[in-house]
């Protein structure tokens, strides 16, 4: 399958703590640096005001959507009350074929619900999952963890599907040959874990569509041993939030431990290039957001506190998923897996 020449990304300009200014800023950078068409979805007045002040020559496409789902609202009821909310309109663009992907830093529950209501699940997929790319100890190597929040309660079958979807993403977007899959558990032994882990382990071991290495303990997730780690959304979200805190904790420790006075200033100056590289490896903003796998379209859910750099990276992530036809590959691979099981 050949990559699409130019991805069309619908950006929810009204979603997030710093909307619309930081969202528009990240989208403008993406329109300049990425081979993609950006559609800004939201209230045209503040969007245009920002453009007039900061990028008067820019001419991005603005799709009007005057409502927004606020963080404190219940997702389903808000989506029904506000059919013209920015996240609804963005999803409708994908459904109508006017866009290839959605990026939103708004209400994550609303983004997931809108994707399910507007786009629907891929045939054969029981539950979509949010996948987050995390850094590992090995330079240039990442690990995809899913689910990190879409499903707090899971069945063993769901985890098996997460592994299939994650393997496809890892292979085609992260360029990992034969991705190694691990099941997050409390021990390496096959007999360890609760009922969900034990039953999921059996399914993963039997699945011929993936390369299942076995159980992954918490200490193994960032070791580089695994390319894909699957778990339920409750555990995954806790893991994600913990991993996201590591960067700020490390920076704070370095600040406290560096000597004061001129020695500290000199040490900081000498270490600055290395500290910048460390930050790039561990900063969650570098990865942009989580990919909602299993819906009939590409949807990136960014952190609510995302600013322009994170939005840019989220759009880059969406473009990569579109170019590599992740949704189509998931559907095809899952259908192949079903056919193999039927023949067995």
From Swiss-Prot:
<dbReference type="InterPro" id="IPR012281">
    <property type="entry name" value="Phospholipid_synth_PlsX-like"/>
</dbReference>
<comment type="similarity">
    <text>Belongs to the PlsX family.</text>
</comment>
<keyword id="KW-1208">Phospholipid metabolism</keyword>
<dbReference type="InterPro" id="IPR003664">
    <property type="entry name" value="FA_synthesis"/>
</dbReference>
<comment type="pathway">
    <text>Lipid metabolism; phospholipid metabolism.</text>
</comment>
<keyword id="KW-0963">Cytoplasm</keyword>
<dbReference type="GO" id="GO:0008654">
    <property type="term" value="P:phospholipid biosynthetic process"/>
</dbReference>
<dbReference type="Pfam" id="PF02504">
    <property type="entry name" value="FA_synthesis"/>
</dbReference>
<dbReference type="GO" id="GO:0005737">
    <property type="term" value="C:cytoplasm"/>
</dbReference>
<comment type="function">
    <text>Catalyzes the reversible formation of acyl-phosphate (acyl-PO(4)) from acyl-[acyl-carrier-protein] (acyl-ACP). This enzyme utilizes acyl-ACP as fatty acyl donor, but not acyl-CoA.</text>
</comment>
<keyword id="KW-0594">Phospholipid biosynthesis</keyword>
<protein>
    <recommendedName>
        <fullName>Phosphate acyltransferase</fullName>
        <ecNumber>2.3.1.274</ecNumber>
    </recommendedName>
</protein>
<comment type="subunit">
    <text>Homodimer. Probably interacts with PlsY.</text>
</comment>
<keyword id="KW-0808">Transferase</keyword>
<keyword id="KW-0444">Lipid biosynthesis</keyword>
<dbReference type="GO" id="GO:0006633">
    <property type="term" value="P:fatty acid biosynthetic process"/>
</dbReference>
<dbReference type="GO" id="GO:0043811">
    <property type="term" value="F:phosphate:acyl-[acyl carrier protein] acyltransferase activity"/>
</dbReference>
<keyword id="KW-0443">Lipid metabolism</keyword>
